Regions:
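Transition segment at domain starts
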Residues: 47-64
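Secreted/periplasmic proteins that engage bacterial cell-wall peptidoglycan
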Residues: 62-89
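Bacterial N-terminal signal peptides
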Residues: 10-20
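Acidic/hydrophobic-patterned starts of short beta strands in beta-sheet-rich repeat architectures
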Residues: 77, 84-94, 146-156
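Acidic, small-residue rich beta-repeat scaffolds with periodic aromatic anchors
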Residues: 6, 19-52, 116, 122-181
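Structural motif
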Residues: 99-108, 162-166
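Bacterial N-terminal signal peptides that target proteins for export
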Residues: 1-12
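Extracellular C-terminal loop/segment signatures of secreted glycoproteins
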Residues: 104-123
Length: 181
């Protein structure tokens, strides 16, 4: 009788445990690099197999540099009002496949009338670069030849210890300057 009671108690406890634990396990972990579902579907359709760069994709030194400046933010995703219209806009660094090789691509996604517009801006090569935003302002290229006066936040696409490129919306198109080379 004692064995049967113990078996029923253990079985009930296990069932209750599974009922509470299973939903927590079934939910995906949020690492700050997750995309809205509808955008994820659009990215998957346009770039099959692509994914957003995360901290694990960075070289050890690059991860330290990024975390020093941006904490636990996602290195492959930044939300900003790039176009100045207040509509959802994200800059993404995607890891894509080019044959057997990994490649990276910077894209800007902009939600207009419940549809995401995806605009490729640049490629970054096989070693994962990062992206972040900067406030509106005056920016001069590394050579001192070109100046951008941004009225909206800008995008910085960077491969630490190699290069950094700034992208600003001019109202008519995207202006690009090298801020580190």
């Amino acid at each position: 009788m004692y064995t049967q009671l113990r078996t029923v108690t253990v079985s009930a406890a296990a069932c209750i445990g599974l009922c509470f634990v299973q939903p927590a396990v079934a939910l995906p972990a949020s690492d700050g690099c997750s995309l809205p579902r509808d955008l994820r579907l659009e990215i998957t359709a346009k770039y099959p197999g692509a994914r957003v760069v995360n901290l694990k994709d960075l070289l050890v030194d690059d991860r330290k540099f990024f975390q020093s400046d941006h904490g636990k933010a996602c290195p492959g995703l930044i939300k900003l009002d790039f176009y100045g219209d207040g509509k959802p806009t994200l800059a993404l660094v995607l890891i894509t496949k080019n044959g057997a090789k990994d490649n990276t691509q910077l894209v800007v996604t902009h939600e207009v009338e419940a549809k995401w517009r995806i605009t490729p801006l640049d490629t970054g090569g096989p070693i994962a670069p990062v992206v972040w935003g900067q406030p509106p302002g005056k920016y001069t290229d590394v050579y001192g030849n070109k100046t951008v006066r941004a009225r909206q936040p800008v995008i910085v696409f960077c491969k630490y210890e190699a290069w950094a490129i700034l992208y600003a919306w001019t109202g008519k198109g995207v202006s690009k300057i090298w801020i580190m080379d």
